Amino acid sequence: MNRELDRLVQNITSRLDKVNVLEISGNRWKVEGETVKYTQVSYPEFDICQNVLPGDFNLIIAEMVFEHLPYPYRAGRNVFQMLNTPGFFVISTPFMYPVHNHPIDCTRWTRAGMKYFLTECGFDENRIHTDSWGNRDCVKAMTPGPVEYDEQQHSLENDPDYPVSVWAIANK
């Protein structure tokens, strides 16, 4: 998943003259450069379900946070409101992953479910690309909880019937 998201974010930022990034609850994507403005907020200190930031964001990234939101549809509509046209929203969430209450764990989406979710938040369904990664061995290895990746034991081959994580890129 990280490899694919890295590729997606690199592809987006390479096509934009100026990049104004908002990252919600993370700092992995700190994109740097002369033409980059980077803002980071953390949930629950900044409640994306209730608040919007002023700004002209053309890239908003929410990696592994929306599953923790009590009102993800409100948050999705707030993201849509904060995003410039054209702009990109990159979101990832777990699917077949142990419950992890930080502070709560509420929601999971399949690839199709993620597309419907983003459509209900205001994005055009024809401008949403979803994908997923996982496999049966990965799901079994995480029982009873997350494990560190071991190249010798764990396959990276994708099986769409066993998604561990789901992500989307929505273009406004």
Where are these regions (language model features)?
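N-terminal accessory regions of S-adenosyl-L-methionine
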Residues: 1-39, 129, 137-153, 161-169
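Hydrophobic (often cysteine-bearing) scaffold residues that line and stabilize catalytic clefts
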Residues: 1, 5, 57, 110
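S-adenosyl-L-methionine-dependent methyltransferase catalytic module, highlighting the catalytic core
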Residues: 70-80, 84-172
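Conserved SAM-binding loop
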Residues: 10-100, 111-115, 168-171
